């Protein structure tokens, strides 16, 4: 009797472990997060290059040129292992030159990279101009450094502390914990700006009634251009295809193209109030997505609860709020505020911009609806079937990736 009971308990334990291993909340490859360099898989070509560098470093230096080559190979090897070094040196050089110059006005050529430009005299408002592109470009480098530094120096040791031994799972946690950090800052920052504006709780009429918003407060412009830099940096990594593409790679590329078009058009044509609301909907929902995936990697009992919160915020922010904005384009765009095309006064809220705004937001909504279908399918299986298998995750599961990792170590 005891033996039979023990066998039954063992079977339950095995089944529970199997079910947990099949859990794929952590493998939901949707949302806007793009992997960083620190989380990229090591290819055969990169391994061969590393071997060549190590061979060159261990060789004898017969000439001065050999010593220079060793210095160069040493730097390349360090940069290969710590990909944040190059952007760090660029940032240090630019910041040092700017602050040591003693000139922190817009007459300094470096000002357009380090600080926002076009301050309206005697006010906290800032206009827009071509120099804003320099700011976005420089902070693309900043976000590259921040992402890789946090992953390599802060998050990776933390995953070791949490006893995450699988390299594959560790890399996935690097991506998601960075997303938690970024969205955990940008989401509340955006909500703070919204709270101190006339848009609180996603009001739509002020988006059109006060148009055009030609100047923005300091924090608003910092937030908007910072988000532009973040998304542009993400897009660059995505286009380079430094990681094996996800199954929804085309949808992800399409999502980034639409997002960048929305950022550019909303900024240039003064629809930044609408852009602020859309930024917030993406950041807050992505925070809960990354949090649920991270908890899943840690086999936390809170995973289902947080995943439920994620589903709620995703539906409310990415669908209810976004569809309300779409509806406002059809019902309020013409009637609230000026509705005229006038290049002299920068009035672009007219019959030309209405369909463009609607199509771009609708395109974003279509991608989100596709991802919602996948989310609800996982939620259904979680509730009714007790599994969380995601059929649209990478072709290799966590388990197969970890098996390959073990084979490589054995070889």
Curated annotation (Swiss-Prot):
One of its GO terms (molecular function) is sphingosine N-acyltransferase activity. As part of the ceramide synthase complex, inhibited by the sphinganine analog mycotoxin, fumonisin B1 (FB1). Activated by ACB1, as part of the ceramide synthase complex. The keyword Metal-binding does not apply. It is a multi-pass membrane protein. It is an enzyme of class 2 (transferase). Induction: Expression is controlled by CBF1. Glycans are attached at residue 103. The modification Phosphoserine is found at residues 23-24. Fumonisin B1 binds at residues 252, 303-304, 318, 378, 381-382. Residues 103-130, 195-217, 269-273, 335-353 are lumenal. This is Ceramide synthase LAG1. It comes from Saccharomyces cerevisiae (strain ATCC 204508 / S288c).
